[in-house]
Protein backbone atom coordinates (compact mmCIF):
# COMPACT_ATOMS: atom_id res chain seq x y z
CA UNK A 1 0.00 0.00 0.00
CA UNK A 2 1.38 3.43 -1.01
CA UNK A 3 1.44 5.87 1.91
CA UNK A 4 2.97 8.80 0.01
CA UNK A 5 1.13 12.12 0.33
CA UNK A 6 -0.90 12.97 -2.80
CA UNK A 7 1.48 15.78 -3.84
CA UNK A 8 4.34 13.25 -4.11
CA UNK A 9 2.76 11.90 -7.34
CA UNK A 10 4.00 15.01 -9.19
CA UNK A 11 7.63 14.34 -8.24
CA UNK A 12 9.68 12.55 -10.93
CA UNK A 13 12.27 10.53 -9.04
CA UNK A 14 15.01 8.93 -11.14
CA UNK A 15 15.55 5.18 -11.61
CA UNK A 16 17.35 5.07 -8.24
CA UNK A 17 14.41 6.72 -6.49
CA UNK A 18 16.26 10.03 -6.11
CA UNK A 19 15.71 13.65 -7.10
CA UNK A 20 18.31 16.47 -7.07
CA UNK A 21 17.68 19.09 -4.41
CA UNK A 22 19.08 22.61 -4.62
CA UNK A 23 19.43 24.53 -1.35
CA UNK A 24 19.24 28.31 -1.80
CA UNK A 25 19.57 31.01 0.84
CA UNK A 26 16.04 32.38 1.32
CA UNK A 27 17.31 35.89 2.09
CA UNK A 28 19.98 36.59 -0.53
CA UNK A 29 19.35 33.94 -3.20
CA UNK A 30 22.84 32.40 -2.99
CA UNK A 31 22.98 28.75 -4.05
CA UNK A 32 24.35 26.90 -1.05
CA UNK A 33 24.54 23.28 -2.16
CA UNK A 34 23.09 20.50 -4.27
CA UNK A 35 22.19 17.17 -2.71
CA UNK A 36 19.81 14.28 -3.31
CA UNK A 37 16.48 13.32 -1.78
CA UNK A 38 14.50 10.12 -1.83
CA UNK A 39 10.77 9.90 -1.02
CA UNK A 40 11.39 9.59 2.71
CA UNK A 41 13.75 12.59 2.81
CA UNK A 42 11.36 14.77 0.82
CA UNK A 43 8.36 13.76 2.94
CA UNK A 44 10.25 14.41 6.20
CA UNK A 45 11.48 17.77 4.92
CA UNK A 46 7.93 18.81 4.02
CA UNK A 47 6.56 17.57 7.35
CA UNK A 48 9.20 19.08 9.65
CA UNK A 49 10.43 22.18 7.82
CA UNK A 50 14.02 20.98 8.28
CA UNK A 51 16.15 19.89 5.32
CA UNK A 52 16.68 16.15 5.10
CA UNK A 53 18.66 14.62 2.26
CA UNK A 54 19.70 11.15 1.10
CA UNK A 55 23.41 10.45 1.48
CA UNK A 56 24.48 8.34 -1.47
CA UNK A 57 27.85 7.58 0.13
CA UNK A 58 26.37 6.51 3.50
CA UNK A 59 23.16 5.09 2.01
CA UNK A 60 21.01 6.68 4.71
CA UNK A 61 19.01 9.79 5.50
CA UNK A 62 21.16 12.83 6.20
CA UNK A 63 19.48 15.38 8.41
CA UNK A 64 21.45 18.49 7.47
CA UNK A 65 23.34 19.72 10.51
CA UNK A 66 23.02 16.52 12.53
CA UNK A 67 26.79 16.49 13.10
CA UNK A 68 27.80 20.10 12.47
CA UNK A 69 24.82 21.96 13.94
CA UNK A 70 24.44 23.78 10.61
CA UNK A 71 20.79 22.92 10.06
CA UNK A 72 18.63 24.29 7.27
CA UNK A 73 15.15 25.61 8.07
CA UNK A 74 13.00 25.38 4.95
CA UNK A 75 10.96 28.49 4.14
CA UNK A 76 9.78 27.45 0.68
CA UNK A 77 9.81 24.12 -1.15
CA UNK A 78 9.41 24.20 -4.94
CA UNK A 79 9.27 21.70 -7.79
CA UNK A 80 10.61 22.59 -11.25
CA UNK A 81 8.54 22.52 -14.46
CA UNK A 82 9.51 18.93 -15.30
CA UNK A 83 9.01 17.71 -11.74
CA UNK A 84 12.55 16.35 -11.59
CA UNK A 85 14.36 18.90 -9.39
CA UNK A 86 13.35 20.40 -6.06
CA UNK A 87 14.42 23.79 -4.74
CA UNK A 88 14.59 24.45 -1.02
CA UNK A 89 14.74 28.10 0.05
CA UNK A 90 16.35 27.86 3.45
CA UNK A 91 17.74 29.69 6.42
CA UNK A 92 21.24 28.28 6.89
CA UNK A 93 22.03 28.02 10.60
CA UNK A 94 25.53 29.31 11.34
CA UNK A 95 25.95 30.58 7.78
CA UNK A 96 27.91 27.47 6.75
CA UNK A 97 26.43 24.95 4.29
CA UNK A 98 29.59 23.30 2.98
CA UNK A 99 31.60 20.61 4.77
CA UNK A 100 34.71 22.66 3.89
CA UNK A 101 33.57 25.36 6.34
CA UNK A 102 32.36 27.76 3.65
CA UNK A 103 28.98 29.42 3.20
CA UNK A 104 28.41 27.64 -0.12
CA UNK A 105 29.72 24.51 -1.81
CA UNK A 106 30.21 26.63 -4.95
CA UNK A 107 33.41 28.38 -3.84
CA UNK A 108 35.55 27.79 -6.95
CA UNK A 109 35.27 29.91 -10.10
CA UNK A 110 36.71 29.19 -13.54
CA UNK A 111 39.11 32.00 -14.43
CA UNK A 112 41.41 32.79 -17.34
CA UNK A 113 41.33 32.32 -21.10
CA UNK A 114 39.56 29.17 -22.28
CA UNK A 115 42.77 27.35 -23.26
CA UNK A 116 44.48 27.91 -19.92
CA UNK A 117 41.58 28.45 -17.51
CA UNK A 118 41.73 26.99 -14.03
CA UNK A 119 39.50 26.72 -10.98
CA UNK A 120 40.28 29.40 -8.40
CA UNK A 121 39.02 29.37 -4.82
CA UNK A 122 37.17 32.66 -4.36
CA UNK A 123 35.26 32.24 -1.09
CA UNK A 124 36.92 32.04 2.32
CA UNK A 125 36.70 29.28 4.90
CA UNK A 126 34.49 30.66 7.67
CA UNK A 127 35.29 27.92 10.15
CA UNK A 128 37.91 25.18 10.08
CA UNK A 129 36.14 21.85 9.42
CA UNK A 130 38.30 20.29 12.15
CA UNK A 131 36.34 22.45 14.61
CA UNK A 132 32.96 21.67 13.01
CA UNK A 133 33.02 17.86 12.87
CA UNK A 134 34.04 16.07 16.01
Swiss-Prot record:
Protein name: Phosphoribosyl-AMP cyclohydrolase
Function in brief: Catalyzes the hydrolysis of the adenine ring of phosphoribosyl-AMP.
Cofactor note: Binds 1 Mg(2+) ion per subunit. Binds 1 zinc ion per subunit.
InterPro entries reported for this sequence: PRA-CH, PRib_AMP_CycHydrolase_dom, PRib_AMP_CycHydrolase_sf
Organism: Bordetella petrii (strain ATCC BAA-461 / DSM 12804 / CCUG 43448)
Subcellular location, record wording: Cytoplasm
Catalytic activity line of the entry: 1-(5-phospho-beta-D-ribosyl)-5'-AMP + H2O = 1-(5-phospho-beta-D-ribosyl)-5-[(5-phospho-beta-D-ribosylamino)methylideneamino]imidazole-4-carboxamide
Superkingdom: Bacteria
Pathway(s) annotated for this protein in UniProt: Amino-acid biosynthesis; L-histidine biosynthesis; L-histidine from 5-phospho-alpha-D-ribose 1-diphosphate: step 3/9
PANTHER family named in the record: HISTIDINE BIOSYNTHESIS BIFUNCTIONAL PROTEIN, HISTIDINE BIOSYNTHESIS BIFUNCTIONAL PROTEIN HIS7
Binding-site residues for Mg(2+), renumbered to this chain: 80, 82, 84
